[in-house]
Amino acid sequence: FDKNAEVYNSLFRLGFGFVEVGTITPLKQYGNPKPRVFRLVEDKALINRLGFNNLGAKNVVNRIKSNSKIGLLGINIGPNKDTEDRLKDYLECLKIFHEVADYITINISSPNTEDLRSFHDQTKLNELLQMIDKEKKNLNSKTPIAVKISPDIDEQKIDKISDVLLENNVEAIIISNTSDSTRNGLTNIQRHQKGGLSGKPIEEKSTKLI
């Protein structure tokens, strides 16, 4: 919602216990072409294909520094679409945000960034989290790390992912991102739009994952 950390203090004043901003990438990017958000009223759902549109990490961190937070602020980070090194992008964002964030969310689950969900592979996820943990030690950072996962994980894979998360000093798991699953049960004319599905249609799936 608050992609560029523009209204987090206003949200705190409304009574929210915490606010998470982002997803933020190292460099500014536009995201996918518009239209990229579709409301499926009859299905009580949304489909979005925003594509990590944001102003870039340095612009956002400067905004946060000039507008002191009055509540618990999480910062959601991810790689740029055209990056040559996604691991490096996560580390760059960690370096930029660890001093201003109350926690940092590692987003590995957006269906709108090609192959991002490959980080649900046990080996790739372990490599990423080991590098995050090593960088935190280099920075002498105590900022808690959360990982945001997909609802489209099968039962065999979730056990392996859970083991990796527990082994790598991850403090929280966010369940879940939007779903890339079939839309056959939906009725709205926009149901086949490309993007991540959220809302009532994935309630059972995400709750089961919890």
Listing of model-derived features with the role each one plays in the protein:
Residues 1-2, 24, 78-82, 109-111, ...:
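Active-site beta-loop-alpha junctions enriched in small/polar residues
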Residues 1-73:
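N-terminal capping/small domains of soluble enzymes
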Residues 11-12, 97-98, 166:
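Non-catalytic positions within long, well-ordered alpha-helices that form the structural scaffold/packing
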Residues 17-21, 48, 73-77, 104-107, ...:
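Hydrophobic faces of well-ordered beta-strands that scaffold small-molecule active sites
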Residues 23-34, 46-47, 102-122, 182-184:
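Glycine-rich, proline-tolerant flexible connector loops at the mouths of alpha/beta enzymes
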Residues 44-72, 121-147, 192-210:
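Alpha-helix-loop-beta-strand connector modules within alpha/beta enzyme cores
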Residues 79-91, 118, 124, 146-166:
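Active-site glycine- and acidic-residue-rich loops that bind
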Residues 111-124, 164-210:
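Glycine/Thr-rich beta-alpha phosphate-binding loop at enzyme active sites
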